[in-house]
Structure formats: C-alpha cells, structure tokens
C-alpha cells in the first residue's frame, strides 16, 4: 500500500460532546444517533470531492482504461473509470495549494509516473494521522457518554475523542491530534488540532504537506440507502480500484438497504492551503469479520508494485 510525506502539528480551539447510543439529550428531545459498528468503503481511498466549492487534491491518473487478466482493454462501458493502482498522480494545479505545497505534490506525481515508489506513513508503517487515516477502507465506532473510540482496519490504529470538552490551553502534539466533539442534532462533530510532525506525515496519499496550523473538522451522520448509493457512484468514478473494483473484504452486502454513514470533513491550514476545503466519504455497514492487518508483517504490497524502490517495513521500528 502507499503513504506520503509532509509536516504536522497544530493548536486551536474546538467543541464536542457524546452520548450513549439510545440515550436522550437533556437539551431537546432528539436522541443520540446510533453510529456504532463497523463501517466500510471498498473503493481505493474512497474520498469524494464536494459537489461544489474547494475540494481535495485528486488523482489525475484515476481515469485510465481498464484491462482484463490477459491484458486486453475492457469496453469503456464496462469500466470507464478504473485507476492504475500503482499510480498516484496528485493534481498539483488544484488552486487550494500554495506554490510550495503544489511543488511537493508535483514532485511526488513525477516519481509515481516514473514508476518509483516514495515513502508515506502507510508504506513505512508509521501512524497515518488525520485526515490521511480517512483513506482506510473501514472504521469501527464505539460510542460512550464521555468519549468516542475510532478503530481503523489498518495496523490497529486508534483515535480517542473526548466529548463535550474544550481543547487544552496548550495542546501536546500527537500523531492523531487532540480531538474533542459534540452532537448537533443527528450529527456527530469532531474538531481536531495539535498534530505531531513526522518524517512521512502528509494530508493525503499524494504527499500534500501540512503545518502546525492544520485543523480538521469531521461531521458524521446517517443517510438513507438511496443517498448513499448516489455517493458511492460518485466515489467509484473517483476511486475505483485498478482491475475493476471493489475490495472483497469491505464489499457491501447487496441485500442491505439500511442506513449508511456519511463523513463530511473540512481541512484548513494557512501554511499550506489558500482556503479551507472539504470532502466526503460514505460508508455502509460491514457484517464480515474484522481481519487483522499488521503493517510490520508486510502482508501485501501496494497494488502489484513488486519492484517498488521504497520497501515496506520488514519488522517493527519499536
């Protein structure tokens, strides 16, 4: 799999609060939404640009002709938006990027086009941080009155969100930042600042950097099946896996017509971006067993890039 490099650490202020799954809030009669469970999105990275307004850096190589196992091109009608899973060519012309950040993304794109792997938190087995961690296929939410715990499918990464509390006056930088949250009606809102700087840190898989000014605000809510289906169709065009498709582990149950989980997040960093930008990720409930994925065991390389010049860790660094 692949990761990226950049900078991180932050400080700011925020808000948040959490309740148990069916507990009623004292303010009003609205009940706490049940967001608990395992939620999956099988598309590679699964990030959907907004319908309007500033959006994230996207993969310029994502819309490539698909080929079958024998190397024959598939009809465009069958697979018009299939990526080459080995190429991560970030759109460095995106106007959200300041010149220095655009240059970083461009250099990563040139390496990828040349078939050269580059280090990232994912392929170097380092903490992914936020919002990079949203590129994981799945997340499990555990709701409690005073906190929310978020477990991600890759390498046992964990985030903890304190409910209804402010950020401390002095935030101690950490890999996942200081996260506080609250409910706004049917929506869980999480505000995160104070990110630690690491050698491979990045906002996304294209190497987009960040600074100590990084702030990420997440909004989670349940949406109906029809809205989720439309979102997944958009996600397929942006994020389809090379070869046609959907990962078996997190593929949705075709008979499931229940609620889906929508994540809308906003990213701001005055040291890197010209403006705040937003993106969405849409999850469906996962009924399969949660598989173990330990990066240091090197269970698989990114895509089919067996000759990548950047090796995946063969053993833990700790």
Language model region names:
Residues 17-19:
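N-terminal signal peptide c-region/cleavage motif recognized by signal peptidases
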């Amino acid at each position: 799999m692949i990761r990226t490099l950049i900078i991180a650490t932050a400080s700011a202020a925020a808000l948040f609060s959490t309740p148990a799954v069916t507990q009623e809030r004292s303010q009003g009669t609205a009940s706490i939404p049940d967001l608990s469970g395992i939620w999956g999105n099988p598309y590679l990275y699964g990030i959907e640009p907004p319908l309007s307004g500033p959006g994230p850096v996207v993969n310029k190589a994502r819309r490539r002709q698909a080929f079958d196992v024998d190397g024959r091109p598939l009809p465009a009608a069958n697979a018009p938006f299939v990526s080459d899973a080995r190429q991560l060519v970030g759109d460095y012309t995106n106007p959200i990027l300041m010149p220095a950040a655009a240059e970083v993304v461009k250099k990563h794109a040139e390496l990828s086009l040349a078939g050269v792997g580059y280090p990232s938190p994912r392929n170097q087995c380092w903490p992914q941080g936020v919002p990079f961690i949203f590129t994981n296929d799945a997340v499990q939410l555990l709701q409690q009155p005073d906190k929310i715990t978020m477990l991600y499918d890759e390498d046992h990464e964990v985030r903890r969100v304190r409910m209804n509390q402010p950020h401390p006056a002095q935030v101690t930088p950490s890999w996942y930042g200081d996260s506080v949250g609250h409910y706004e009606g049917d929506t869980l809102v999480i505000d995160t600042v104070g990110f630690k700087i690491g050698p491979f840190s990045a906002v996304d898989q294209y190497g987009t950097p960040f600074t100590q000014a990084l702030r990420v605000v997440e909004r989670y809510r349940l949406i109906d099946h029809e809205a989720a289906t439309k979102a997944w169709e958009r996600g397929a065009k942006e994020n389809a896996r090379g070869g046609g498709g959907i990962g078996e582990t997190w593929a949705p149950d075709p008979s499931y017509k229940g609620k889906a989980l929508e994540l809308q997040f906003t990213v701001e960093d005055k040291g890197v971006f010209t403006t705040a930008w937003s993106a969405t990720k849409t999850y469906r409930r996962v009924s399969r067993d949660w598989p173990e994925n330990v990066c240091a065991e090197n269970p698989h390389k990114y895509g089919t890039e067996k000759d990548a010049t950047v090796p995946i860790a063969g053993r833990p660094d700790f």
